[in-house]
């Protein structure tokens, strides 16, 4: 068998048997992307950024999370892409919309109406030119309590601290430890059950990217690795509960949670952020975190 990127060419039945025996190992492989593939991933991720910017225009009191989902899906399709989340593992919508104590994977609903003082994490993905883009941002709905806004800022800051550690030759645990150390120093807790991930032609590839861990541990960061770093940080306890819908994750103590995510590539000259908050921050202006 010839392994070229993420594609295999099987020549005969004996080779097929050999590959089948290796599948458990292959599924744990970290695929390094070429320069051309990274540029295609950048395009998919930039579209995610533009979609979040479009959604940001409509995050106001009185709007439902289902309305936001429809806006995102229409924008993605109008730009020649496919919503990556829609149908993924049976997920019914194009964005995850997680409000207040919902950590991640909130299912958009006509019954979930945003109100003044809420916060909402919008996680969005696209498939464009055969590659997946994935990014998330936690928005304020109107005026938000100062202590909640502080949580959001700390979570976003921890994302960039993690990205700073995403250097070729370092270890994955350096990223994880930077996020954990900073957030816990601010009095917040790090969710354990949910992690970031590798990304490419599939939304979830190896390696897993925890937001906690030890420096110097984990896979070696190599040129061409593409990963999603996504701190999920709670104001109270780190403990979470999974809702009966099979998707939504909440904080057990019902205190607020925040979630920010960038897709990055490991490069010889340092980490490159493939996704973007620029478009939504242009919409939010002074209200951006």
Predicted regions and their residues:
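Single conserved hydrophobic/aromatic residue that forms the stacking wall/gate
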Residues: 1-12
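Intrinsically disordered, low-complexity regions of eukaryotic proteins
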Residues: 9, 16-17, 136, 232
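Intrinsically disordered, low-complexity peptide-like regions
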Residues: 10, 24-25
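Generic extreme N-terminus detector
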Residues: 12-13, 33
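Intrinsically disordered, low-complexity polyampholyte segments enriched for Lys and acidic residues
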Residues: 14-17, 27
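Active-site neighborhoods and metal-handling regions in enzymes and metal-associated proteins
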Residues: 25-289
